[in-house]
């Protein structure tokens, strides 16, 4: 079997040299997608789908984070189970892709509007495939164990057939209908959008107070509105039946101030008696709440706004004008006719299109809907059953339940070219009659020009990836998927809709586990966005630091549901870790085996085995719960604190034996395998270079290490280890170097004196037993079973003075940070990320202060 070309460990660590040829090796051998020799051939694989990125550009740092998390999990499962299936793909991203393509065309002064539908579609397709290849190349640079042979695209011919078949099936079952109703309309993109594509933003507006005269009277009601242009479509006026001010007006008529039509005064408890004048105009054609009232009271539904954002013929002399231009002219008209009272500046939530950032207009339109209200109760039972699906972190279940409680039918049609064209047909002579089928019913029929919402096909992604109808056995093995990893901000757009579709079509969940991660924030804890120009290109990070460093930074800061702040220092720390790992590998590789002794294993070796077993079990427990920050830290702490700084250093200062050398290499091999899911490039290269016994052609074909069997008890090395750490800390406190010699006195008998003497010598410490010597002026270092005293006669005044100054500075920082954290206004008004950052800063100051104070106390 093909192996990777060996790399020279003698050279300095360089991420570009380490990564050279590795991706090609993985792609050509595809070892990740071959069953490992230890796996059960009849077992189901660990199956997972890659959230398909949009075809609108390049991968951003958020994609890199999501993919790094998935790859860590997939490689871990490969090492545990031996069989994985991770399907890649891209999303056609209807609105986003079409608008970006058309924007590029306008920049090039190309008139795409002259093209017929087919030409326009094909041009977008060609452009999108170029973008798709860019995304694919970027994904490969991260070193992902994807099954590229099964790559999917949401708008491929196969996907299109699947999506249209589903549409027909759900229509026949009564879950999809076409109805004339009030929808959210994007006047810039000229298409309907769904409720969750409307983003509420605080916006300052003018609240206009306008007179509505009563019929045959000089009396009038004052009505407040932010949208005076919609008065042309008013069909009633409402007051609250409990509002004493307006009792006498019940069931009277008022005159519409713009078109002079008579409209009734009706009553309903929905009316807010605290807002404006507490008299509400009812415009069902342009407001969702008014629309609900119109259904309740069977009112007429009028619309005075066109789909392009201009006013229609109902607006009389303002017909054809842009609604915002018309608004100003209408106010002037009302003022001139003495029907205008005043305006107030108010700030309120206004709905904006998530895609175009224009204010959404509620407009009456005939659209296709998935009637989710028919089955939402079943979905709620499903997501609340942990035997069906587990959500990490669990707190998001409350958010999901709240959304399901307020779920509305899903508008699935869009007025675009780029997408799955709806398979509905209309007779030329009877356009109100519709036939839903994949193929045309005949020459007298024309097809619906609308396409499906992008999220409709995205909701079918787990099925598109596995349900090809050809291999039922493979489908059953992979569906439901083992896991979905995605950001929490698309739970409603995508995750719940996948659950909707899987339940409707398969009466099943689409995945067993749902892992939600947060968002990538900048160094100031702000969300990355184009407007702030604070985005980070992952490819630039890879060029500078390497894919391993980027991946290690991202996964080492990942806790379920939490955001991550981009931090250059942490990337540097990740790169430093890799450099240390390289140097450790080089040291082990260069040990002169001809000088190894025949000494057997001792308490130090028993200790490192116990530590390895503890860490291995702990890491697996954390990985099962997707707590990558904790698992990565536990492994890195073991490698540096236990293996490198204690085990390797003590053996290096003593003398390596054959048994110790073999154990060191065995543990090194094992934690290389355990590190592999986080940093695949460097671990692949080192593994290949070492030529371990029974090694595989690739580290990905290895099995996750089991526990190392050991019959010996821990002996007393924990006490030895703790004493060594305290002596190292003592030397650091007194600014001593490791080579400086110390005398360590003790009175009580020590059962492990042989090993203690041996390993203290490596720290340049002489162990001396005493009987009656006075110890009052010496420094005490206590262990669980003994007291040791350090002989130190040097002047410590300078060290004490330095510590006093440092402690004073830290005390001021603790006080300052504590005042900020405990400030009620700061806690209430500051963004969560900013508050948590200050809290962490305080904790760091307090920890550093304690260390300095402890050091000072030891010197007194």
Swiss-Prot record:
List each coiled-coil range. 794-860
Positions of short motif 'KMSKS' region: 527-531
Give yes or no: UniProt keyword DNA-binding. Answer: no
Q: Which GO terms describe its biological process?
A: valyl-tRNA aminoacylation
GO function term, MF aspect, one: valine-tRNA ligase activity
InterPro entries hit by this protein? aa-tRNA-synth_I_CS, aa-tRNA-synth_Ia, Anticodon_Ia_Val, M/V/L/I-tRNA-synth_anticd-bd, Rossmann-like_a/b/a_fold, tRNA-bd_arm, tRNAsynth_Ia_anticodon-bd, Val-tRNA_synth_C_sf
The entry's ATP-binding residues are 530
Subcellular localization, as worded in the UniProt entry: Cytoplasm
Q: Which UniProt keywords apply?
A: Aminoacyl-tRNA synthetase, ATP-binding, Coiled coil, Cytoplasm, Ligase, Nucleotide-binding, Protein biosynthesis
GO CC annotations on file: cytosol
Q: Tell me the enzyme class.
A: ligase
Which reactions fall under this protein's catalytic activity? tRNA(Val) + L-valine + ATP = L-valyl-tRNA(Val) + AMP + diphosphate
Q: Could you confirm whether the keyword Coiled coil appears in this record? A: yes
State the SUPFAM superfamilies in the record: Anticodon-binding domain of a subclass of class I aminoacyl-tRNA synthetases, Nucleotidylyl transferase, tRNA-binding arm, ValRS/IleRS/LeuRS editing domain
Q: What is its EC number?
A: 6.1.1.9
Q: What is its main location?
A: cytoplasm
Motif 'HIGH' region: chain residues: 53-63
Matching PANTHER family, A to Z?
VALINE--TRNA LIGASE, CHLOROPLASTIC_MITOCHONDRIAL 2, VALYL-TRNA SYNTHETASES
Domain note for this entry? ValRS has two distinct active sites: one for aminoacylation and one for editing. The misactivated threonine is translocated from the active site to the editing site.
Quaternary structure, from the entry: Monomer.
Q: Which family does it belong to?
A: Belongs to the class-I aminoacyl-tRNA synthetase family. ValS type 1 subfamily.
Described function: Catalyzes the attachment of valine to tRNA(Val). As ValRS can inadvertently accommodate and process structurally similar amino acids such as threonine, to avoid such errors, it has a 'posttransfer' editing activity that hydrolyzes mischarged Thr-tRNA(Val) in a tRNA-dependent manner.
Q: What is this protein called?
A: Valine--tRNA ligase
